[in-house]
């Protein structure tokens, strides 16, 4: 008799995705982050649901409703901080996941890669709208500045911004619709993640060597389920350390001041995970140019499969490309630092150099390195 997990219509899907799935025998801990992202998403949806039970999306009561959650709701403080810091953990896992894909050439799976880019944009949009909801100073001014960027679009820009605002400034209508979108988008993300996984399982996972591992596959369970549980425990431990010992470490003190349209904070900046893109935006002294650079800083990922010039898929045996990859990582960390600094010398120049280097590395230096490494192979 066939095992029920292989015959039952629902269990069969779970079995083929998480139990009997053939996986390469040599995938390292860098492959843990997909499952960690799934855990982050489930955790964010659960904590978000409980927060939504007590939150009110009205400009007069939003700030006090968040204070009420922290003070009066049973364990409201931990739910709120798990949700806020859970977003940070989500982005750490997300950036490592993308970095892994870049390093090991996982972008050769085109459908999986492109759905991943759509997922990245959706998660960024969700996080941005979530940051607006507590209705503190940085929430309000962040929403004002970022939505205003759309006014740089020729002809339709101003109309588009007012349409998003639901009025002539960021106000009650904006907050209500941002709450609605912030609630629905995680479910869109979950659906997209399902499609992401569907396309991945069409080809099977990549591995550190970038060579086909069809002749050496092992079942996902128990090998990688155990490995994923270890990763999950480390993720939860890190998150709990953050939430219980320093919940406001990654937040902005300005967001503990209620939103005031008449008082602009001295430094408007987004959460830390958007600072690299914000630094690229600010490094161009033209509004439309800055907005284009901001969008392209993420959209450039879609070009990476086209820019792959090497005969080898992975960077595992390509030292020049490895150096450039880690230079890119250092450059992104530099941009993150610059994004949090005021717009004054020497930070302006550092930001401009780092932005140029970011695009140069991806568009020029890495493809050239691939060609050079191909020639080295002939020696």
From Swiss-Prot:
It is found in: Mitochondrion inner membrane. Heme b b562 binds at residues 83, 182. It is a multi-pass membrane protein. A ubiquinone binds at residue 201. Signal peptide: none annotated. InterPro entries: Cyt_b/b6_C (IPR005798), Cyt_b/b6_C_sf (IPR036150), Cyt_b/b6_N (IPR005797), Cytb/b6-like_sf (IPR027387), Cytochrome_b (IPR030689), Cytochrome_b_C_euk/bac (IPR048260), Cytochrome_b_N_euk/bac (IPR048259), Di-haem_cyt_TM (IPR016174). Binds 2 heme b groups non-covalently. Heme b b566 binds at residues 97, 196. GO terms for molecular function: metal ion binding; ubiquinol-cytochrome-c reductase activity. PANTHER family: CYTOCHROME B. Heme 1 (or BL or b562) is low-potential and absorbs at about 562 nm, and heme 2 (or BH or b566) is high-potential and absorbs at about 566 nm. This is Cytochrome b.
């Amino acid at each position: 008799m066939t095992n029920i997990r292989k015959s039952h219509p629902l269990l069969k899907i779970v079995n083929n995705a998480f139990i009997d799935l053939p996986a390469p025998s040599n995938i390292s801990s860098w492959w843990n982050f997909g499952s960690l992202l799934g855990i982050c998403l489930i955790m964010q949806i659960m904590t978000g649901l409980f927060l939504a039970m007590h939150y009110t999306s009205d400009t007069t009561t939003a700030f006090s409703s968040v204070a009420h959650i922290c003070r009066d709701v049973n364990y409201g403080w931990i739910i709120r901080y798990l949700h806020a810091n859970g977003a940070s953990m989500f982005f750490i896992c997300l950036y490592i996941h993308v970095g892994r894909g870049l390093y090991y050439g996982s972008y050769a799976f085109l459908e999986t890669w492109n759905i991943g880019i759509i997922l990245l944009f959706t998660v960024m949009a969700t996080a941005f709208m979530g940051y607006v909801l507590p209705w503190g100073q940085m929430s309000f001014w962040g929403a004002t500045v970022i939505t205003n960027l759309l006014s740089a679009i020729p002809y339709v820009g101003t109309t588009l911004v007012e349409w998003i605002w639901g009025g002539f400034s960021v106000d009650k209508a904006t907050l209500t619709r941002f709450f609605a979108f912030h609630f629905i988008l995680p479910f869109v993300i979950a659906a997209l993640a399902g499609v992401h996984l569907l396309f991945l399982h069409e080809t099977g996972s990549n591995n550190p060597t970038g060579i086909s591992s069809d002749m050496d596959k092992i079942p996902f369970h128990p090998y990688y389920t155990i490995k994923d549980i270890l990763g999950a425990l480390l993720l939860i431990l890190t998150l709990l350390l953050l939430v219980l010992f320093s919940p406001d470490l990654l937040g902005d003190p300005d967001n503990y001041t209620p939103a005031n349209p008449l008082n602009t904070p001295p430094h408007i900046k987004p959460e830390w995970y958007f600072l690299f893109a914000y630094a690229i935006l600010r490094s161009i002294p033209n509004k439309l140019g800055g907005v284009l650079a901001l969008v392209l800083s993420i959209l450039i990922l879609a070009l990476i499969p086209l820019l792959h010039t090497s005969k080898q898929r992975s960077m595992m045996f390509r030292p020049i490309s490895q150096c450039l990859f880690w230079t890119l990582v250092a450059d992104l960390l530099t941009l993150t630092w610059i994004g949090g600094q005021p717009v004054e010398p020497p930070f302006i120049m550092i930001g401009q150099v780092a932005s140029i280097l970011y695009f140069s590395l991806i568009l020029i230096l890495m493809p050239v390195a691939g060609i050079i490494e191909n020639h080295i192979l002939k020696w």
